[in-house]
């Protein structure tokens, strides 16, 4: 079955205050990394519009998913260990 989510919104504000800026040696690249991380997380949440769960059985064999997708990014799959 698949659960459809009602659109919901989260307002997020991230502030790199002066204390944080000086803590990291006034390195503007550190601030840029924080900005990139926030944009990445925002991108994840924009794409999650539904969630499916398979209670009775796996509809897609897990080995197919791992072989084609996950193993590229997950070292645990490369060594054939459970996630």
Curated annotation (Swiss-Prot):
Entry's localization field: Secreted
Keywords: Apoptosis, Fibrinogenolytic toxin, Fibrinolytic toxin, Hemostasis impairing toxin, Hydrolase, Metal-binding, Metalloprotease, Protease, Secreted, Toxin, Zinc
InterPro entries: MetalloPept_cat_dom_sf, Peptidase_M12B
EC numbers: 3.4.24.-
Tissue specificity statement from the Swiss-Prot or TrEMBL entry: Expressed by the venom gland.
Enzyme's top EC category: hydrolase
Cofactor: record remark: Binds 1 zinc ion per subunit.
Chain ranges of the Peptidase M12B domain: 8-83
Activity regulation (record text): Inhibited by EDTA.
Amino acids binding Ca(2+): 11, 77, 80
A single BP term in Gene Ontology: apoptotic process
GO MF term set: metal ion binding; metalloendopeptidase activity; toxin activity
Family matches, as Gene3D superfamilies: Collagenase (Catalytic Domain)
Pfam families for the chain: Reprolysin
GO CC term, one of those recorded: extracellular region
Highest taxon above the source species: Eukaryota
Job description of the protein: This protein is a zinc protease from snake venom that is devoid of significant myotoxic and hemorrhagic activities. It hydrolyzes the Aalpha-chain and more slowly the Bbeta-chain of fibrin and fibrinogen, without affecting the gamma-chains. It induces cell detachment and a apoptosis (anoikis) in endothelial cells.
Protein family: Belongs to the venom metalloproteinase (M12B) family. P-I subfamily.
Name of the molecule in the record: Snake venom metalloproteinase BnP1
Species whose genome carries this gene: Bothrops pauloensis (Neuwied's lancehead)
């Amino acid at each position: 079955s698949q659960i459809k989510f009602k659109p919901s919104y989260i307002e997020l504000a991230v502030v790199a205050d002066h204390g944080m800026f000086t803590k990291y040696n006034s390195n503007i690249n550190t601030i840029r990394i924080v900005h990139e991380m926030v944009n990445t997380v925002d991108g994840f949440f924009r794409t999650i519009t539904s969630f499916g769960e398979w209670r009775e059985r796996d509809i897609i064999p897990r080995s197919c998913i791992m072989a084609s997708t996950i193993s590229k990014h997950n070292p645990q799959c490369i060594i054939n260990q459970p996630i």
